[in-house]
A protein has these predicted regions:
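Sec-dependent N-terminal signal peptides
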Residues: 1-16
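Compositionally biased, proline/threonine/alanine/serine-rich low-complexity intrinsically disordered stretches
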Residues: 16-61
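Gram-negative and organellar
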Residues: 50-70, 77-687
Length: 687
């Protein structure tokens, strides 16, 4: 709101125009001299420059350089009708109606260069839109560069068919209605000097509501309302040494983190299990759950680049951090629950937990670029990422059933778990590329990448091998590429990766895969350009217990037509065809093996034609829109036609209006459809 008020005071500045033409005209007698024939001999400079004794000296001509330039777009969004599922609309679009500051962009310059030489300000989406930003950059040559960046995202996700066994009734058990805010500030001192200190601060926070599931003893899931709060602050500072042959950066930073979430429920709530267990139905009547996390970390970073010879560049980077966290958890619940391992029903439970963890984390990278010949480049890069977790959790659980007077009868003895475990993850990568310019038009690239690592992490709850699980990673990747410029108008780029893996971490990891990409661009003339793109991925894991297969393709064609520099008409269009097909084995509820399949065949198209109105070339109309349609496991259709109109009212003022129609539908989940018209109309002030 403060920003909007400040903008209102700035609007009058757009109305100020450059000095009137009458003030810039010369005096009548000066006009006559200026309009004299070119062949008339000019008077000597010393004579023409001397003013007459009886005439005062003329005032210097006013400067036409403006200290302020920019534009502001504001208007009102109107949604006259809406039909369909409001939660799906908010999960995909989430546009509201009312006054909006759609865009702000201006520049301030100080001719006297006092506090700053130049200041740039930009803002977008203010007034209630789900994504709004503000950005400021100020600089004074040789003294400082300051950048401030603010972003706010309203994230809503409550698709009824997701994580909801009762769909279309009930609600998404993984729902979110939160705001995420991010602020970044960077200050660089003495920019352009050999030694440049800098300071930076980052703040990221989230707050809002949601729905999550509470799971007692893996027997049932209960969807409960949740309050979400978290924030992270990062402080860093350092110095850069910049010389002709080498650059060095030394940085020290720290991070603080906190997360405070809580869930509560009162009243009878049934879980996802609809069938009875031993003749009884499980339910939840009350719940109070809280957990808090606090974390800190200090890190050190050093990086350097050097050019010892004209044919050799070297670089390296090292980062060490040691984050530490503490956790506190508690819950107390009443209802009808069961311990399947002892076939015992109980009416209440209480859990208390605390823990601490420490994670030394080391990351390093190094590499070089060597140019033994003008047409040949050799690039080598190596990186390693290693961290070790040391954790010590302490958890107590107690169960009760019924009451005897004021005495709660224990249903089962309290359990206490005190664990000490560690996790270790090591990741390494080495890559070599050779790039050869075979001719002035043809460049070839070949390379090899080797990825290896090992990990020992906390196992899942159904693990039969103990609390920890170990794995290894070995992957060999071949690389190839081609860049061919047949003429100034035609260029082609090809890239390929082929891999064979001995060990992987996850069932769906890249294993034996091939990935390719092709791009082509042809410019028929100065007005017409066509671009094409093709990508493909084929990943296979033939392990008899996995049998994972993933095939994905994407083909796109785009056209840009701008005759006569788009003064009267321009056209942009793009069509995209994509397919995804995957299969993998899994174990069902009774350990019966089955196959999970997913398929999606999609078509996406976008087009926009801009036309200058007859007799009013400054007025523009845009006709176009986009659509998405897919067939397969989740068939869906999404249409967005649009019309835009921009009409100049006077030199610095434009009237802009836009209409869009949003239509979304699914064949299998028809209750998730919505349709709406959205209008926005407003003005643009320009100076």
């Amino acid at each position: 709101m403060r920003l909007l008020i400040a903008l209102l005071f700035m609007v009058p500045a757009f109305g100020q125009q450059t000095p009137a033409a009458a003030e810039q005209q010369t005096k009548p007698e000066q006009q006559g001299a200026a309009q004299a024939p070119a062949q008339e001999p000019a008077k000597a400079d010393d004579q023409s420059a001397k003013p007459k004794a009886d005439e005062p000296a003329a005032n210097p001509a006013p400067s036409t350089e403006s200290w302020f330039s920019g534009s502001i777009d504001f208007g009102y969004r109107y949604i006259p009708d809406f039909s369909g599922n409001r939660n799906v609309y908010r999960s995909i679009l989430d546009l509201g109606q009312g006054p909006r500051l759609t865009a702000l962009d201006f520049t301030l310059t100080d001719p006297k260069k006092r506090l700053f030489d130049r200041m740039d300000v930009r803002a977008n989406g203010w007034g209630g839109d789900p994504y709004n930003t503000a950005w400021l950059s100020a600089r004074k040559s040789g003294w400082y560069d300051l950048t401030l960046d603010y972003r706010n995202i309203a994230y809503f996700n409550a698709v009824p068919s997701f994580a909801n066994p009762s769909a279309p009734a009930g609600f998404d058990e993984q729902s979110f209605d939160v705001h995420r805010r991010n602020f970044t500030g960077d200050l660089e001192l003495l920019p352009g000097k050999h030694i440049t200190p800098y300071l930076a601060f980052d703040h990221n926070s989230g707050y809002g509501n949601g729905i999550t599931d509470w799971v007692p003893d893996q027997n049932d899931n209960f969807a409960v309302p949740t309050l979400l709060r978290d924030s992270t602050n990062n402080y860093r500072g350092g110095v850069r040494f910049q010389y002709n042959r080498f650059h060095i950066t030394l940085e020290q930073g720290g991070t603080t983190f906190k997360d405070d979430d809580s869930a509560s429920e009162s009243g009878l709530t049934l879980g996802d299990r609809t069938s009875a267990i031993l003749g009884q139905t499980l339910d939840l009547t009350s719940l109070h759950e809280n957990y808090g996390i606090r974390g800190t970390s200090i890190y050190t970073k050093a990086q350097a680049t050097t050019n010892p010879f004209s044919w050799l560049d070297l670089y390296g980077q090292f980062v060490f951090s040691e984050p530490k966290v503490t956790v506190n958890y508690s819950d107390i619940a009443t209802g009808n629950f069961v311990l399947l391992n002892s076939l015992l029903f109980y009416s209440g439970q209480q859990n208390l937990g605390t823990g601490a963890a420490n994670q030394p984390h080391t990351t390093g990278s190094a590499g070089f670029e060597m140019r033994p010949r003008k047409w040949l480049r050799i690039l080598d890069s190596w990186m390693t990422d290693r961290y070790h977790d040391a954790a010590a959790p302490f958890v107590t659980q107690s169960y009760t059933t019924g009451t005897s007077g004021a005495i709660t009868v224990p249903a089962a003895p309290s359990s206490i778990a005190a664990l000490n475990y560690s996790q270790v993850v090591n990741y390494n990568q080495e890559q070599v590329d050779v790039i050869a310019s075979v001719t002035s038009r043809l460049t070839l690239r070949g390379g090899y990448r080797f990825v290896w690592g090992d990990a020992t992490v906390l196992a899942g709850q159904l693990s039969q091998s103990g609390p920890l699980a170990s794995g290894q990673l070995h992957r060999n990747v071949g690389l190839a590429g081609l860049n061919y410029r047949m003429t100034q108008r035609l260029s082609v780029n090809l890239d390929y990766e082929g891999s064979s893996s001995d060990h992987i971490y996850f069932r769906t990891s890249l294993n034996d895969y091939q990935k390719g990409r092709a791009r082509a661009r042809y410019q028929f003339n100065n007005a017409l350009t066509v671009q094409a793109r093709f990508t493909a991925l084929d990943n296979q894991n033939p392990d008899p217990s996995i049998r994972y297969s993933l095939r994905a393709q994407d083909t796109a064609l785009s056209v840009f037509w701008t005759p006569k520099e788009a003064k009267r008409i321009s056209l942009m269009g793009e069509y995209d065809r994509s397919t995804v097909n995957s299969q993998i084995l899994y174990l069902g509820n009774f350990l019966a093996q089955g196959t999970s399949s997913y398929r999606d065949d999609a078509h996406t198209a976008t087009a926009a034609m801009t036309v200058a109105l007859p007799k009013y070339p400054a007025a523009k109309i845009v006709l176009g829109g986009s659509f998405f349609t897919s067939n397969g496991s989740r068939t869906s259709h999404y249409y967005q036609p649009l019309v835009q109109l921009s009409v100049p009212i006077e030199k610095h003022l434009y009237w802009n209006t836009e209409w869009k129609w949003y239509g979304y539908a699914e064949d299998f989940y028809q209750y998730e459809a919505f349709r709406t018209n959205v209008f926005i109309s407003g003005f643009r002030l320009v100076r």
